[in-house]
UniProtKB/Swiss-Prot annotation:
This is Uncharacterized protein YxbD. The gene is yxbD. InterPro entries: Acyl_CoA_acyltransferase, GNAT_dom, N-term/lysine_N-AcTrnsfr. It holds the Pfam family Acetyltransf_1. CDD domains: NAT_SF. GO terms for molecular function: acyltransferase activity, transferring groups other than amino-acyl groups. Residues 1-139 form the N-acetyltransferase domain.
C-alpha cells in the first residue's frame, strides 16, 4: 500500500470517497466549513489504486487542524500511518501543535487519538445542532445509538 499526497490522488476518487463515507465532501464543524476534497492531506491506496484511508488537514498560523481521518479497513495501521504522516508534515513546517474536532458519539476516535498522545482540550456543547443547520444530513443518532450533539477538541503538542 502506498501513501501519497491527496493532490496526487484523482479528485473524482477523493470526492467519491467522501460522498460514500460522509454523505458529501463538505465537513461542517465548529471551526468552519470545509470541502475535504480540496484540502491538503494524504491518501493510502491499495494495489488496485483504490483509497483505503484518507487524512485531510489545514495549516493555521501556529497549528494544524485535522479535518478528517478515515480508514476503510480497521486495525491494520492505516489510520496510524496517515496520522503519523500528517504529524511529520507539521514538524517539517515547524508547527508545534496539531488538533482536531470529533463528536461525542465517536467513542472509537476518542480512544484512537488519546492512545496516540492527544488530550481532551475543550467541549463545545450542542455544536452539532448548529452544524446540522448547514448540513441537514448529519444524523441525530450514531450507529451506536448515542445522540450526536456535542463536539470535543483534542490537541497534541508535537516535539
Amino acid at each position: 500500500m502506498n501513501i501519497i499526497p491527496t493532490c496526487q490522488v484523482p479528485k473524482d476518487l477523493v470526492s467519491a470517497f467522501f460522498q460514500k463515507h460522509w454523505g458529501s465532501p463538505q465537513m461542517v464543524i465548529s471551526s468552519g466549513i470545509y470541502n475535504c476534497d480540496e484540502l491538503d492531506g494524504y491518501g493510502m491506496l491499495n494495489d488496485d489504486n483504490q483509497i483505503v484511508g484518507l487524512i485531510t488537514y489545514i495549516f493555521e498560523e501556529d497549528a494544524c487542524e485535522i479535518i478528517s481521518l478515515d480508514s476503510v479497513i480497521e486495525n491494520k495501521g492505516i489510520g496510524t500511518a496517515l496520522l503519523e504522516k500528517a504529524e511529520e508534515a507539521c514538524r517539517e513546517r515547524n508547527i508545534k501543535q496539531i488538533k482536531l474536532i470529533t463528536t461525542n458519539d465517536n467513542i472509537h476516535a476518542l480512544a484512537f487519538y488519546q492512545k496516540r498522545g492527544y488530550r481532551l482540550d475543550r467541549l463545545f456543547v450542542n455544536a452539532v445542532e448548529t452544524a446540522r443547520k448547514m448540513k441537514p444530513e448529519i444524523p441525530l443518532l450514531a450507529d451506536n445509538k448515542i445522540p450526536i450533539r456535542d463536539e470535543l477538541l483534542l490537541v497534541k503538542e508535537l516535539q
